[in-house]
C-alpha cells in the first residue's frame, strides 16, 4: 500500500479485516493503460451489438466510457483517491449527536453495472475526535464510486468512520433506487431499498437509535 495516505491505509486494512472490502484483484496497469484496454474492449462490445462506431455520435463512445470508468464512476476502487481527512481533537467536549443527512450518492450495481441513485444519512457521537463535516460526504462518495451492493456500501461507510474517529458510535443509513430493478427485470419504477448499519451506542441504546432514525423523517 505504498503511496497511500495513512487514513486510506487504516480504512482499507479495517475493511479487509472484517471481510467488507469490495472484491478486487490488483494489477500493475497504470491509469492510462487501463483506459486504453477498456476502450479496446468496449469498442469490441459495441461492435458486437452492431453499432456503427464510424458514426460521429458514436466514434468517441468507447474512449468516453473508459475515461468515465477510471476517472469517475469507479474511481473509488483506487485508494489513491481516498479523500484527505481532517480529524481534530474534541477540545470543545462536544458530546451530542452529530448528524448529516440528505447526502446524495450515485453508485453502480455490481451485478448489472447500472445506476444506484440515493441518499445517505450519517451520525456519530463525538468522543476524543471530531471529523470535518464535508469529509463525511466525501467518504460516502468515495465508497459510492465503485461497483457496489448497497448492504456492503453501508457497512463500508460505517467502518471507515469508526476507524477514523476511533469510536464505534457511528450510524449510517442509505435509501436508494436501483436501476437494475427499475429499468430491467421486474421494472418497478417506485420501490426504494433502505439499509442501515449501527455501531456502539446506536446499536446498544434504543433511545439513541430512535433519536437517529426519528431525525431522518
From Swiss-Prot:
Residues reported to bind Zn(2+): 109, 112, 180
EC number: 3.5.4.16
GO BP: one-carbon metabolic process; tetrahydrobiopterin biosynthetic process; tetrahydrofolate biosynthetic process
Short name of one Pfam family: GTP_cyclohydroI
GO terms assigned for molecular function: GTP binding; GTP cyclohydrolase I activity; zinc ion binding
Keywords on record: GTP-binding, Hydrolase, Metal-binding, Nucleotide-binding, One-carbon metabolism, Zinc
Record carries keyword Aminoacyl-tRNA synthetase: no
Keyword Transmembrane listed: no
Pathway named in the protein's UniProt entry: Cofactor biosynthesis; 7,8-dihydroneopterin triphosphate biosynthesis; 7,8-dihydroneopterin triphosphate from GTP: step 1/1
Top-level taxon of origin: Bacteria
GO cellular component term, pick one: cytoplasm
PANTHER family, A to Z: GTP CYCLOHYDROLASE 1 (PTHR11109:SF7), GTP CYCLOHYDROLASE I (PTHR11109)
UniProt cross-references to HAMAP family, sorted A to Z: FolE
Family: Belongs to the GTP cyclohydrolase I family.
Assembly: Toroid-shaped homodecamer, composed of two pentamers of five dimers.
Name this polypeptide is given: GTP cyclohydrolase 1
Amino acid at each position: 500500500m505504498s503511496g497511500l495516505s495513512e487514513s486510506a491505509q487504516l480504512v482499507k486494512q479495517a475493511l479487509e479485516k472484517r471481510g467488507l472490502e469490495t472484491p478486487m484483484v490488483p494489477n500493475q496497469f497504470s491509469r492510462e493503460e487501463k483506459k486504453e484496454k477498456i476502450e479496446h474492449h468496449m469498442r469490441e462490445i459495441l461492435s458486437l451489438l452492431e453499432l456503427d462506431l464510424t458514426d460521429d455520435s458514436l466514434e468517441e463512445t468507447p474512449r468516453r466510457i473508459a475515461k468515465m470508468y477510471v476517472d469517475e464512476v469507479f474511481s473509488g476502487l483506487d485508494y489513491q483517491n481516498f479523500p484527505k481527512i481532517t480529524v481534530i481533537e474534541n477540545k470543545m467536549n462536544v458530546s451530542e449527536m452529530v448528524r448529516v443527512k440528505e447526502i446524495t450518492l450515485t453508485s453502480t450495481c455490481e451485478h448489472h453495472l447500472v445506476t444506484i441513485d440515493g441518499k445517505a444519512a450519517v451520525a456519530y457521537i463525538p468522543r476524543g475526535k471530531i471529523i470535518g463535516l464535508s469529509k463525511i460526504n466525501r467518504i460516502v462518495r468515495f465508497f459510492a464510486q465503485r461497483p457496489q451492493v448497497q448492504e456492503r456500501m453501508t457497512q463500508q461507510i460505517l467502518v471507515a468512520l469508526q476507524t477514523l474517529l476511533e469510536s464505534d458510535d457511528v450510524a449510517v443509513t442509505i435509501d436508494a433506487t436501483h436501476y437494475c430493478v427499475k429499468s430491467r427485470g421486474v421494472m418497478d419504477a417506485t420501490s426504494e431499498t433502505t439499509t442501515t448499519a449501527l455501531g456502539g451506542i446506536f446499536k446498544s441504546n434504543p433511545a439513541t437509535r430512535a433519536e437517529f432514525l426519528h431525525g431522518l423523517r
